[in-house]
Amino acid sequence: VSSIAILGFAAPTLIAVYRAGVDKHIVIVLIGLSIFALGIEATSILTGFPYSRFVYGNMIGGRVGGLVPWTVPFAWVPLVIGATARLATLRSHPLFSLMCGFYLMAIDLLLDPAAVKLGFWTYEYGSAYYDVPLQNFGGWVMTGTLATVVWTFAFRKTAHGDAIATLFLTCAFWSSVCLFKGLYIPAVIGALLAVDALRWAEAHKKQNRAVFSPVN
């Protein structure tokens, strides 16, 4: 796994954005979410909030300010977009953003144990769940919810089924890693998420053309 792999997983979402027509509005939102991703990671590294205190290794790209790898926005923002795509039928629900936050937390139940096992990052204090602090998962709910609020506020209509491919690739790959490393609970979670993403994509083939309608 390297920065190239992270960009590869992000590619379907980036292609979806490109197909939609890259305008100033989309660029501003994506840059804003990327800065948020870098900033919240740096805050957690320095203060322990919201993910718990941790430190990155050198395996996934050079670190911005010596703290956060530049690849983080390419890993995280596409997952946010994918979550809003997967749960798009619930968009009118008042708790839509929170549901996306919990969906992203489910993905992290897969990602974090594998990343810790491979030495991508190390927490100061772990837990019984594969040395990942439970606080970290609450942090994912919080940041995922906030990011979804921004995304859905910026775009009145978002149909971007192509972004589901990022979810599938990410979950399928990391569930395989977890299985190989003996992390069986995360492996099962990842397999379920991957199958769900694949089934969703099959059921919504006609909606796979990306459309972004900004709020005026």
Spell out what each predicted region is.
Residues 1-216:
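Aromatic-rich, lipid-facing transmembrane alpha helices and their immediate juxtamembrane interface loops
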